């Protein structure tokens, strides 16, 4: 009875759970970056049984990649701004960082998971331009994604607890899924404890929710990573997908022999020891007024960990009215992947973040030791 009352009150008040996959960037997020999806966090499957049974709901038209009724977009097929190519490449066996964004006005706790379907024929139905899968095909794909859950417990050293809002014996009492903090505690935002607007949502600003997953030893030139979040408070489920590529794991080193040979020189495009850190120059064309400055804030310590007071400032030494360029060079660890935004700081200390979804950058692993990122304020 108590559960029914909670559901009824939540729906009556118009409050809805809101969130979407942001790293790797989902189809939903890409369409939001381009502009047409004005509420990426509104891709909701509702009303359905979301708790305590996490997998009993049929996905219907939402499919494993989501349908946003607010903007009438079905993400189970490629669109003009998403789905034509992978946004990231993994190797089988990789441990990868993943992240989603929960809206400040729609954090209803619960549990979430990441899945990969290894039936390429089913996935191809979600990759074919101009083809909209039927609801039966969407459900078949969803069943495959459920079978391909990437357990939290597959990543060594990762904390994989049980939901504080679930009890032993309930279907939600499992730790292969990831859990938010308790609904009476800090909910999903408590996973990272990131500041407000650490990721983009259109309603009330978002908080990042980060985890790590282990990529299966499976090879596909184009497949999908499906994210699913089951709300504790409301009868709602979130489903979004990112287009990814998975290559074969690195081959094992051949067994050693007694043969003596002279080490080969590195090929011209490589080197014996790639740089451990890279001096990355960020160049942002940002029009400012007298007294304003520009900083770069992001999800890693070198960018202040989303703390604007600790974010490094850019220099206006090359700024002109025709070329409003702000620059800075920061030493970053090779291979690091992070989210970031430029922020405009008033002389009063007030801060304005760029609009839209967070930018994402991966520091190159090579011998140059330098890299440049050219952007413009958005």
Curated annotation (Swiss-Prot):
Glycans are attached at residue 221. Its EC number is 1.14.99.55. It is found in: Secreted. The modification Methylhistidine is found at residue 18. Starch-active PMOs provide an expanded perspective on studies of starch metabolism and may have potential in the food and starch-based biofuel industries. Its main location: secreted. Keywords: Carbohydrate metabolism, Copper, Disulfide bond, Glycoprotein, Metal-binding, Methylation, Oxidoreductase, Polysaccharide degradation, Secreted, Signal. Residues 1-17 form the signal peptide. It comes from the Eukaryota. It is an enzyme of class 1 (oxidoreductase). Cu(2+) binds at residues 18, 108, 238. Residues 272-378 form the CBM20 domain. Starch-active lytic polysaccharide monooxygenase that oxidizes the C1 position of starch substrates. Catalysis by LPMOs requires the reduction of the active-site copper from Cu(II) to Cu(I) by a reducing agent and H(2)O(2) or O(2) as a cosubstrate. This is AA13 family lytic polysaccharide monooxygenase A.
């Amino acid at each position: 009875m108590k559960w029914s009352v909670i559901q009824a009150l939540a729906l009556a008040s118009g409050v809805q759970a809101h969130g979407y996959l942001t790293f790797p960037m989902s189809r939903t997020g890409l369409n939001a970056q381009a502009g047409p999806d004005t509420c990426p966090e509104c891709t909701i499957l509702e009303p359905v049984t979301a708790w305590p049974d996490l997998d009993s709901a049929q996905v219907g038209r939402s499919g494993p990649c989501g349908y946003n009724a607010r903007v009438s977009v079905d993400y189970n097929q490629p669109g003009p701004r998403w789905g034509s190519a992978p946004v990231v490449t993994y190797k089988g066996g990789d441990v990868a960082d993943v992240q989603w964004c929960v809206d400040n006005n729609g954090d209803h706790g619960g549990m979430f998971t990441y899945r990969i379907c290894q039936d390429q024929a089913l996935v191809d139905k979600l990759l074919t331009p101009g083809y909209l899968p039927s609801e039966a095909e969407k459900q078949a794909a969803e069943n495959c994604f459920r079978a391909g859950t990437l357990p939290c417990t597959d990543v060594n050293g990762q904390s994989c607890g049980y939901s504080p809002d679930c009890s032993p014996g309930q279907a939600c009492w499992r730790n292969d899924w990831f859990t938010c903090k308790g609904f009476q505690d800090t909910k999903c935002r408590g996973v990272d404890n990131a500041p407000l607007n650490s990721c983009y949502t259109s309603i009330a600003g978002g908080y990042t929710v980060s985890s790590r997953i282990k990529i299966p030893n499976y090879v596909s030139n184009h497949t999908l990573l499906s994210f699913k979040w089951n709300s504790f408070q409301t009868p709602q489920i979130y489903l979004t997908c990112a287009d990814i590529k998975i290559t074969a794991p690195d081959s094992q080193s051949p067994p050693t022999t007694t043969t003596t040979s002279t080490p080969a020189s590195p090929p011209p495009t490589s080197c014996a020891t790639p740089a451990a850190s890279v001096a990355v120059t960020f160049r942002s064309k940002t029009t400012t007024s007298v007294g304003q400055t520009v900083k770069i804030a992001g999800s890693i310590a070198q960018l202040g960990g989303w703390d604007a007071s600790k974010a490094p400032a850019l220099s206006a030494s090359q700024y002109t009215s025709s070329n409003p360029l702000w620059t800075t060079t920061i030493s970053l660890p090779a291979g690091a992947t992070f989210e970031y935004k430029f922020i405009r700081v008033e002389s009063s200390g007030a801060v304005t973040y760029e609009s839209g979804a967070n930018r994402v950058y991966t520091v190159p692993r090579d011998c140059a030791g330098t890299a440049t990122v050219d952007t413009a304020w958005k």
